[in-house]
């Protein structure tokens, strides 16, 4: 693939910025919407829980999490995505149910043991340092808290069972992994993982 095409794709989807980032966000809202909703369903959020959504993109899953849980935090390093989240989640932000912050998996800005659930959809392949990201997510989860992660199977940085092994090495327990086919003829197969912080 040419460097120019790679740069365009990175600006639209990998590290969204500028006009391409905003267009990429609209594409993500449509293309990832079913997976975002599925991951929120798999997490079985309760009205008393606090949720962290890593890389919420345009905010489809974050908005739903904010409607189901007590509060949902969204951390994203892209100003364009944060702007789309603020627009999509305006009512939830106004109600105090959603908060958005500049951040990443490796740098959430949250206190230790401050969330019950962490959700991540289609961004683990973009993290700068997966080991540091998993360590940070374990740190912010309360004892017994759960992680639900989903990514396009074909874009995983390593096979899903190897990703599960990385989670175990980071200190997560009760690992489960499976694949899920989102609706739609062209939707890529999603690799999904669920894990808990011990306690």
Q: Across the structure, where does each feature detected by a protein language model lie?
A:
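A short glycine-rich, Lys/Arg-flanked "PGG" loop and its adjoining helix->strand segment in the class I
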Residues: 131-143
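Conserved beta-strand signature within the Rossmann-like core of class I S-adenosyl-L-methionine
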Residues: 144-151
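Core SAM-dependent methyltransferase catalytic element
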Residues: 183-199
């Amino acid at each position: 693939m040419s460097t120019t095409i790679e740069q365009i794709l990175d600006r639209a989807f990998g590290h969204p910025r500028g006009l391409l980032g905003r267009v990429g966000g609209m594409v993500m809202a449509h293309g990832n919407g079913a997976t975002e909703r599925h991951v929120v369903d798999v997490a079985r959020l309760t009205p008393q829980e606090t949720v962290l959504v890593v890389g919420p993109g345009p905010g489809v899953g974050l908005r739903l999490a904010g409607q189901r849980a007590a509060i949902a935090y969204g951390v994203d390093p892209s100003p364009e995505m944060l702007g789309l989240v603020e627009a999509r989640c305006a009512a939830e932000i106004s109600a105090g149910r959603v908060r958005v912050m500049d951040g990443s998996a490796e740098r959430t800005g949250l206190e230790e043991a401050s969330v019950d659930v962490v959700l991540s959809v289609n961004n683990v392949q973009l993290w700068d340092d997966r080991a540091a990201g998993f360590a940070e997510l374990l740190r912010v989860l309360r004892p017994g808290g759960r992680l639900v992660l989903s990514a396009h199977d074909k874009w995983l940085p390593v096979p899903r069972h190897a990703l599960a092994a990385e989670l175990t090495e980071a200190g997560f327990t009760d690992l489960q992994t499976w694949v899920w086919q989102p609706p739609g003829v062209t939707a890529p197969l999603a690799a999904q993982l669920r894990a808990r912080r011990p306690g």
